[in-house]
Amino acid sequence: MEELSQALAGSFSVSQDLNSTAAPHPRLSQYKSKYSSLEQSERRRQLLELQKLKRLDYVNHARRLAEDDWTGMESEEEEEKKDDEEMDVDTGKELPKRYANQLMLSEWLIDVPSDLGQEWIVVVCPVGKRSLIVASQGLTSAYTKSGYCVNTFPSLLPGGNRRNSTTEKDYTILDCIYSEVNQTYYVLDVMCWRGHPFYDCQTDFRFYWLHSKLPEEEGLGEKTKRNPFKFVGLKNFPCTPESLCKVLSMDFPFEVDGLLFYHKQTHYSPGSTPLVGWLRPYMVSDVLGVAVPACPLTTKPEYAGYQLQQIIEHKKSKKEGIMGKLTPRASENGHYELEHLSTPKLKSPPQRPNHPESLMEN
């Protein structure tokens, strides 16, 4: 373990995607790069300022997603690409699909914000896969974060089935985590509700709206013929030390994958952003410096050390690519952030009951 820690200190960046949550946390062995921390903190400040100036046409954007109508998008895409460069938002790998890169993804929470207790909200996330849900024109479609439609079904979401889709403008767009085990879409965030876009609304308002409106849709949390998958809202909590300790001691109706930390003022911006942070529960004590209770969620798993090995292997393959010796294996690792889950699978999983094989694609 000591050798791995020393090797890790050689450099911080594990990928082309800064602090991607698909790779292991850079501070698992108490390693911390001052430059990286300052950079993440500074990028947060800049993004909060720039989002005040950047006002996109989210009404048309939501309509295009709902109606699958992309007429005249070529010129707008060029303009958006320039805006993303100015905003320092990583929209990920370019894919020939209109529904790709529509979700707001997180970075590993490396720099502890000075206003964590006042300006941040935490959401406990289940094991599952991130899904873009579009309910429109009497059907509900589920897309992966790469833009592939993996399922189409009726639902009791506004616009999600022929009975409740009264007008063409009655559509809904949600950011969800799909649990195959529970046959449930856990609703993480809302981008559009009944044709009203919420992209440029602050996180605390989006969450308030979401948890006010979801219970109003009768039968949405039940599995029926008209609603074959349950839709359940994920609760959010304050980020004070007392609140975090209470959250980590709770029992949840699902297998917990990790914690998403949202800045209250951030707008919903597709692509990865430092205004949303990701931690596994057992990292809270080391990274945030919070005294946590001894419970299953805070117990360090046996694969924690393996994550360090993944960092070293990924650094090695990346270095080979830079040197012009990119092997097929290294090339595969080069897309680590897009293809792997929040915690890598073990080649030989540790002998531990109920070890999560498939964690959230975050």
Swiss-Prot record:
Residues 1-40, 69-90, 319-362 are annotated as: Disordered. Residues 69-89 have a biased composition (Acidic residues). It holds the Pfam family SPN1_m3Gcap_bd. The record marks 106, 145, 278 as: Interaction with m3G-cap structure. Residues 210-330 are annotated as: Necessary for binding to the m3G-cap structure. One of its GO terms (cellular component) is nucleoplasm. Gene3D superfamilies: DNA ligase/mRNA capping enzyme (3.30.470.30). One of its GO terms (biological process) is protein import into nucleus. Residues 1-160 are annotated as: Necessary for interaction with XPO1. The keyword Metal-binding does not apply. Residues 11-73 form the IBB domain. PROSITE patterns: IBB (PS51214). Residues 128-130 are annotated as: Interaction with m3G-cap structure. The keyword Nucleus applies. The modification N-acetylmethionine is found at residue 1. The modification Phosphoserine is found at residue 75. Residues 1-65 are annotated as: Necessary for interaction with KPNB1 and m3G-cap U1 and U5 snRNP import receptor activity. It is found in: Nucleus; Cytoplasm. Keywords: Acetylation, Cytoplasm, Nucleus, Phosphoprotein, RNA-binding, Transport. Residues 12-22 have a biased composition (Polar residues). Component of an import snRNP complex composed of KPNB1, SNUPN, SMN1 and ZNF259. Component of a nuclear export receptor complex composed of KPNB1, Ran, SNUPN and XPO1. Found in a trimeric export complex with SNUPN, Ran and XPO1. Interacts (via IBB domain) with KPNB1; the interaction is direct. Interacts with DDX20, IPO7, SMN1, SNRPB and XPO1. Interacts directly with XPO1. Its interaction with XPO1 and binding to m3G-cap U snRNPs appears to be mutually exclusive. Can form homomers. PANTHER family: SNURPORTIN-1 (PTHR13403:SF6), SNURPORTIN1 RNUT1 PROTEIN RNA, U TRANSPORTER 1 (PTHR13403). Belongs to the snurportin family. Functions as an U snRNP-specific nuclear import adapter. Involved in the trimethylguanosine (m3G)-cap-dependent nuclear import of U snRNPs. Binds specifically to the terminal m3G-cap U snRNAs. This is Snurportin-1. It comes from Bos taurus (Bovine). The lineage of its organism: Eukaryota, Metazoa, Chordata, Craniata, Vertebrata. The gene is SNUPN.
